[in-house]
């Protein structure tokens, strides 16, 4: 979904706390080497007194570009390896945060890493493609929450677990995306939505929700656009990231948790 941000959202992007944060805010983003993930790392680093944890697959190749990002006063970035197709990397990465970097809590965790590589009809989709998508798009966010849950509970702010979702995963609106040959991607994101909503109900202390980032000009987004006969996706990474940050900042347990919200204005998508 494309759309421009309100002036209010743009003003809030770099100043989420008008009176200053109560303490250092710790953000964690997966899939941080490019696209939306990299954009979120850049945005969070511009906030004072922030620790921004970038979890990504290839630390060696991604570090030079990430290290060149502007860092606000009192802020820092930590880069940790995480393979989303691993069942053990999330726990190991949390241990690295604690033991090597002295991180004792997390305030915001963004499950952004995803894959979309199979583009055929559901009727002939090979099972191995579905399994691969379920591992990265559903199992990995579950493993991420399980690994970070205790550190989120240590937050002195309102702990937030955020899944970057996709409107193609909604059952109600499936007719709008019926031509898209993205069955494995859609059903794996749908399963992830269920789990995040389940986290909301099971954890009264947690704000857990899904954000539709728009159809974004990333490698994955542009590839999807071409499959639909369009030259590129309509939403820039900058606009998507600004909206995502605004929705995270304003999210509360009462108004946002357990819902699937649109990045531009926070309105809810149907399941």
Curated annotation (Swiss-Prot):
Superkingdom of origin: Eukaryota
Cross-referenced InterPro entries: Fungal_SecMetab_SDRs (IPR051468), NAD(P)-bd_dom_sf (IPR036291), SDR_fam (IPR002347)
Annotated pathway: Mycotoxin biosynthesis; aflatoxin biosynthesis
Binding sites annotated in the UniProt record for NADP(+): 36, 112, 185, 189, 216, 218
Keyword field: Cytoplasm, NADP, Oxidoreductase, Vacuole
Active site per UniProt: 185 (proton donor), 189 (lowers pka of active site tyr)
Chief location category: cytoplasm
Reported induction: Expression is stimulated by gluscoe. The promoter contains a CRE1 element (5'-TGACATAA-3') required for cAMP-mediated stimulation of expression. Expression is also positively regulated by the cluster-specific transcription factor aflR that binds to an AFLR1 element (5'-TCGGCCAGCGA-3'). The promoter also contains an aflD-specific element called NorL (residues -210 to -238) and required for full transcription. Natural plant compounds carvacrol (CR) and trans-cinnamaldehyde (TC) strongly reduce the expression. Zataria multiflora essential oil reduces gene expression.
A biological process term (GO) from this entry: aflatoxin biosynthetic process
Catalytic reaction annotation: (1'S)-averantin + NADP(+) = norsolorinic acid + NADPH + H(+)
EC number, as in UniProt: 1.1.1.349
Disruption-associated phenotype: Leads to accumulation of norsolorinic acid and a substantial reduced production of aflatoxin AFB1.
Region (Disordered): 1-22
GO cellular component: cytosol; vacuolar lumen
Molecular function GO labels: norsolorinic acid ketoreductase activity; oxidoreductase activity, acting on the CH-OH group of donors, NAD or NADP as acceptor
Localization: Cytoplasm, Cytosol; Vacuole
Alphabetized Pfam families for the sequence: adh_short (PF00106)
PANTHER family referenced in this protein's UniProt entry, alphabetically: NADB-LER2 (PTHR43544:SF7), SHORT-CHAIN DEHYDROGENASE/REDUCTASE (PTHR43544)
Family designation: Belongs to the short-chain dehydrogenases/reductases (SDR) family.
Function comment: Norsolorinic acid ketoreductase; part of the gene cluster that mediates the biosynthesis of aflatoxins, a group of polyketide-derived furanocoumarins, and part of the most toxic and carcinogenic compounds among the known mycotoxins. The four major aflatoxins produced by A.parasiticus are aflatoxin B1 (AFB1), aflatoxin B2 (AFB2), aflatoxin G1 (AFG1) and aflatoxin G2 (AFG2). Within the aflatoxin pathway, the norsolorinic acid ketoreductase aflD performs the second step by catalyzing the dehydration of norsolorinic acid (NOR) to form (1'S)-averantin (AVN).
Protein name: Norsolorinic acid ketoreductase
Provenance organism: Aspergillus parasiticus (strain ATCC 56775 / NRRL 5862 / SRRC 143 / SU-1)
Source organism phylogeny: Eukaryota, Fungi, Dikarya, Ascomycota, Pezizomycotina
